[in-house]
Curated annotation (Swiss-Prot):
Name under which the protein is recorded: Small ribosomal subunit protein bS18
InterPro entries (alphabetical): Ribosomal_bS18 (IPR001648), Ribosomal_bS18_sf (IPR036870)
Lineage of origin: Bacteria, Bacillati, Bacillota, Bacilli, Lactobacillales
NCBIfam families: S18
GO cellular component, one term: cytosolic small ribosomal subunit
Keywords for the protein's UniProt record, in alphabetical order: Ribonucleoprotein, Ribosomal protein, RNA-binding, rRNA-binding
Role this protein plays: Binds as a heterodimer with protein bS6 to the central domain of the 16S rRNA, where it helps stabilize the platform of the 30S subunit.
Entry's family note: Belongs to the bacterial ribosomal protein bS18 family.
Source organism: Lactobacillus delbrueckii subsp. bulgaricus (strain ATCC 11842 / DSM 20081 / BCRC 10696 / JCM 1002 / NBRC 13953 / NCIMB 11778 / NCTC 12712 / WDCM 00102 / Lb 14)
Gene that produces this protein: rpsR
GO MF terms held by the record: small ribosomal subunit rRNA binding; structural constituent of ribosome
Quaternary organization: Part of the 30S ribosomal subunit. Forms a tight heterodimer with protein bS6.
Swiss-Prot/TrEMBL GO biological process terms: translation
């Protein structure tokens, strides 16, 4: 009886920042930043979002600025 393989090839994640040719990640663009935050309010890692290291730093800094300005919550509401 032949063994069957589980799973398959994983699709490579696309860097959302590079794909849309965004040079500056604005902290006021909350709709864009919400793609990089979990439902608990934590910043998602590169392995989940598929961003490059450079763009991950830009996103993290923008999220932190938006939190300080009160545009994004520090933690999720229950």
């Amino acid at each position: 009886m032949p063994q069957q393989r589980k799973g398959g090839r994983r699709r490579r994640k696309v860097d959302l920042i590079a794909a849309n040719h965004i040079d500056y990640v604005d902290y006021k663009d909350v709709d864009l930043l919400k793609h990089f935050i979990s439902e608990r309010g934590k910043i998602l890692p590169r392995s989940v979002t598929g961003t490059s290291a450079k763009n991950q730093r830009k996103v993290a800094n923008a999220i932190k600025r938006a939190r300080i300005m009160g545009l994004l919550p520090f933690v999720a509401e229950d």
